[in-house]
Structure formats: structure tokens, C-alpha cells
């Protein structure tokens, strides 16, 4: 089960006969499949229950880091697997196909509707998050960015041949994460921070 189609998450697919991936991830996955010999993939949609052999998880749609990202809810052990959708240090929204901050906020609010069903989040690259209220901190960061809060220029990042201008926002004291997001024109949030103009 792939949370999204980035190479660092689908590389092991060559060892399986079939994989599952979100529908909006399929074009990226198929391109990688041609180059890397990945297995065939079936579409997974929100609400699908996946039997992993003695363990079941439910797919939850999460456009953010990628447009077709999914999280997986393990109700029995009260774990939300987030892949790269929610990380413990930095959430990357600057990738070539990442969604805008406004869409990320909607996805976080959507994920929050399951909050009573998990006690911690298991991420794709960082430590586990043992307080689901962390999602509220990320929603607050999205709100601050969308209302012109103080963002700092991150600089230009080159990823997979694309050069992207990025900014980051780190919240108030106690905020555990940083949102790194693409600069979209017009960069209205720069108005709050003259150092970014």
C-alpha cells in the first residue's frame, strides 16, 4: 500500500505482484514503473478497507504533499499512518505537484474528523507523533500563511529538475513543525514581512 508515488515510497514495489495507490498518483507511478520495473498498481480510494493479512487499514484521502496522497487508519491499534502527508518536523508542500496551502488546510481538517479513532500518527520519515492535537498546530500554520503571517524566504530549491522558490513558516512557541511551501504569484503573504520583498 503506497501513501503516494514518490520514489522513496514506491521503490520496494518491484518485489510485489501488485500495489495499491491513490488515483491522482497514478500518472507519476506509471512513469516510474516504466523506468524502474515497478509492479502493476490498483487504485485505492477513501473508505477502502485493505486486508494486510491479520491487519486491516482504512484509506483516507489526503491531498497535500502530493495530490493523491492517502493516510491509513489502523483502528485496532489506534494508529494513523501518514506517509509524507504529516511529518514530525517539516511538511513539504514545495514539490512540483504539491497542493496549495489552502488545500493542505482542508486535508488536515478532514483528517481531524477521525481524531477520536487514533492516539498517534506514524509518519514516513520522522518520529512518531503521540499527540493528535499536532494536527491543530499545522492547521494554525496554514491559517497564518493564508492570512499573511510572517513567512521567511527559504530560497530556491531544485528538485527533479524544477527550480522552485520556497518559503517556510514556523509557528508560535511550542510549534513542533515547519511548513515549507512554494511561492505562488502573487506572493501576498510576503506583504507581512518586508525582508521577503
Please name every model-derived segment.
Residues 4-9, 65, 125, 183:
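Histidine-centered active-site/metal-ligand motif
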Residues 1-51, 144:
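Active-site HxH/HxHxD metal-binding segment of metal-dependent hydrolases
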Residues 27-29, 34-39, 62, 81-88, ...:
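Residue-level signal for well-ordered alpha-helical segments
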Residues 19-20, 43, 96-99, 191:
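Generic low-polarity alpha-helical segments
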Residues 109-197:
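Accessory terminal helices/loops
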Residues 3-5, 9, 30-35, 49-52, ...:
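Short C-terminal domain-edge/linker segments immediately following a structured domain
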Residues 58-63, 67-146:
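Metallo-beta-lactamase
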Amino acid at each position: 500500500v503506497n501513501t503516494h508515488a514518490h520514489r522513496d515510497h514506491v521503490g520496494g514495489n518491484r518485489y510485489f505482484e501488485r500495489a495499491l495507490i491513490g488515483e491522482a498518483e497514478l500518472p507519476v507511478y506509471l512513469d516510474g514503473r516504466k523506468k524502474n520495473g515497478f509492479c502493476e498498481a490498483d487504485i485505492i480510494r477513501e473508505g477502502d478497507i485493505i486486508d494486510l493479512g491479520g491487519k486491516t487499514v482504512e484509506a483516507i484521502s489526503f491531498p497535500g504533499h502530493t495530490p493523491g496522497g492517502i493516510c491509513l487508519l489502523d483502528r485496532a491499534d489506534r494508529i494513523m499512518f501518514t506517509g509524507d502527508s504529516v511529518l514530525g518536523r517539516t511538511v513539504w508542500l514545495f514539490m512540483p505537484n504539491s497542493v496549495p496551502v489552502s488545500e493542505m488546510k482542508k486535508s488536515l481538517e478532514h483528517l481531524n474528523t477521525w481524531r477520536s479513532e487514533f492516539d498517534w500518527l506514524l509518519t514516513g520519515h520522522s518520529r512518531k507523533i503521540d499527540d493528535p492535537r499536532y494536527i491543530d498546530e499545522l492547521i494554525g500554520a496554514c491559517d497564518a500563511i493564508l492570512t499573511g503571517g510572517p513567512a521567511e524566504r527559504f530560497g530556491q530549491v531544485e528538485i527533479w529538475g524544477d527550480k522552485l522558490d520556497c518559503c517556510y513558516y514556523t509557528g508560535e512557541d511550542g510549534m513542533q513543525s515547519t511548513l515549507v511551501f512554494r511561492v505562488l504569484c502573487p506572493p501576498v503573504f510576503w506583504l507581512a514581512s518586508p525582508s521577503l520583498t
